[in-house]
Each structure stands twice: as C-alpha cells, then as structure tokens.
Amino acid sequence: MAEIKDPENTIVLETTKGKVVIQLFPDVAPGHVERIKGLAREGFYDGVVFHRVIDGFMAQTGDPTGTGTGGSDKPDLKAEFSETRHERGTCSMARTQNPNSANSQFFICFDRAPWLDRQYSVWGQVIEGMDNVDQLKRGEPVRDPDSITSMRVAADL
C-alpha cells in the first residue's frame, strides 16, 4: 500500500474492482475535503455505484440514487476553483451548470481534462489503485455498474 503520510487527509476507497487510495487537498478545497470526509465517516458512499464512466475521461459516483441527479441532504457547496489541474487520477466534484451546486457526487479523471480546470473543485489525487479505477465498467448510464463497497478516512481505520 502507498505510504499514508497524513491519515486524516487520506481516503481509502474499496470498490468492486479493488482498493483506491486518495490524498486529500485541504489547502486547495477545504470545504469540499470536509464534505467528503464527513460523508465518508457517515457511511454515505458505501454501496453507491459508479453511474457514469466515460472511457478516456472520467468515472463518476456519489449519487445514492444511481441516476446522476441525487445527492446528500446537506446544502450545496460554494465553488472552490483553483489552479490545480485535472490530470490522470484527479478527484473533483461534479456539479450542475451552477458553479455552487456541488454536493456529494464526484469524479476521478482517467486522463488530462484541461477544459475542467478552474471550472470544477479539485479536492484530491489518487496515489494508489488507479489500475482499479481503469477497470470500472463503462457507460452512460453503466449497465450492472461497479460500486463503492466502503469509503473511509484512513485515520479511522
């Protein structure tokens, strides 16, 4: 396993394809990091599917309804756009056309996606298990989708 230097700011995501370890960026998107950690600690993401997986682009999850239209019961977040680029393994919040509409849905980039830079709130980076993300079933929507089996803050393990 990758060395976890800051367990309080590291997510361990268990999926139907294997483990994914994500380093959080509290200095870049503090509100989004707190939301991700809070929902993970509540078990919100456990059992949630990857409902939208586009080859060469990204894998999206975080909607408890599995449709891409749902979210948590918490208020939407204010955008925290930054200079952090959307690269392979970047974790960023999904949103509607309203920049301040991120809630619980997020995506992991398969490749560089410069059109997302400064338009979506980046909150982390995959540091281990990107090969498992690469194995997620593709589709919009995905038929018989892969899912998150558990999502935890490393400090709690």
Specify the residue positions occupied by each region the protein language model found.
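Cyclophilin-like peptidyl-prolyl cis-trans isomerases
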Residues: M1-L157
